[in-house]
């Protein structure tokens, strides 16, 4: 029996994951198909980013439009108003830049990948790509002779291992027969002949196994050379894809990186100049001259009566009757419109064009605090018959000095209809006057 024989050698040979094993070239072939799919993935990636750029640009435009209108209608004035408005201008310009990013991504980067993919991969009528089939055929042709030798080698090895197994079994039987009295000399001779025959089979199969192994060793260099040649062709194809996609990614980076865009830098240079141009003293002087002590005034002068002139209507007579929009603020008797009272500190609810009370008179006919009945201008807050009793549905804590506070279930007197801002005038049983949310009460 061959001394190199071991029963472990009868176990199935473990296949390795090496490229040189039969069929393991398929990973290299699959890489070609993967390259085509990765081009599609990159185009989808770019397309999604373009959608994000477009949406962000539109959001900036909408935001700038809304706030530009609010600022124009709001109370801010002068150079600071212009500085604030410059933020909206920045948004519009940046929006345009993001739209440019979107256009560059779609019209340049995506189209570049699409055209390269079309030139690099050629579809076949029967499916798949020409490049994939060429690689598959090249590897198969290079591997075919060696694969045939490997098949012969596997068969020779299997025959040799089987002969060794038979030899060991025959020797075991022959040795056991010597200790058994029932075995005749003739049977003993047959067992010995079997052992001799098995030894001859082992010798023959070993010689054949070694010869085939030698042949495989001789064909291996040529096999490796042929496989390397096909593999290098695949490497060159893949190198083109890798280099190309790297260039595309750099183009994408250049289009996305607004920090290196001269127009983007110019936008913020202009914005900073606009903000630094705001001058508090200039704004204060402007307000003084247009809404403060610096305004011109037609001071009262003695005017002779002229019977030939028509009756001159005073400003008070021309002034339209105040709507229900008069609200008492506190015990000092200050008055403000309900539209102003309804504005709770947000410029979005402010209207620069809203009217302001420009007339003041101690004439009780126009003074809601006057109590004389002779002038027909009785205080509406002093007569319960002119109010409506209501009950609070919820607790409310006044946020401003002109607002009432009450608890759910408290009763008070409603002294006017709900204004456009959702507020009503009312009076608590304690006599306090003020505003409250109209939807916080119900009629009794």
Swiss-Prot record:
The protein's assembly and partners: Homodimer. May form heterooligomers with other PACSINs. Interacts with both COBL and DBNL. Identified in a complex composed of COBL, PACSIN1 and WASL. Interacts (via SH3 domain) with SYNJ1 and WASL. Interacts (via SH3 domain) with DNM1; the interaction is reduced by DNM1 phosphorylation. Interacts with DNM2 and DNM3. Interacts with MAPT. Interacts with EHD1 and EHD3. Interacts with TRPV4.
Task: Provide the protein name.
Answer: Protein kinase C and casein kinase substrate in neurons protein 1
Domain called F-BAR: residue spans: 13-283
Q: What is its main location?
A: cytoplasm
Q: Is Coiled coil one of the keywords?
A: yes
* Positions where Phosphotyrosine occurs in the chain: 394
GO CC, any one term? cytoplasmic vesicle membrane
Q: What is the organism of origin for this protein? A: Pongo abelii
| Phosphothreonine, modified sites | 184
